[in-house]
């Protein structure tokens, strides 16, 4: 059983949903929206249609001139916020 504070991100790939931790990726028996609902009152935020990240595991954000946001996680994973979610993330960051 994974604890929410262990999870760096939750993502969908190939029709399956995975929780990524420092120890690897684990298959979840949930849809992404179900995982998002279960973690609604925590530090998790959706950054694209296929990914949710744990804000407590973010090492840094890199804003580019083109408006995209690159996210570096504590486990070394680098991912991007989709255009649809950029405004929401900027609001969370106070930008």
Specify the residue positions occupied by each region the protein language model found.
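Conserved binding/recognition cores within well-folded domains
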Residues: 1-80
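Short coil/turn motifs at secondary-structure junctions
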Residues: 76, 86-88
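Charged phosphate-binding loop/patch that engages nucleotide di/tri-phosphates or the phosphate backbone
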Residues: 84, 91, 95
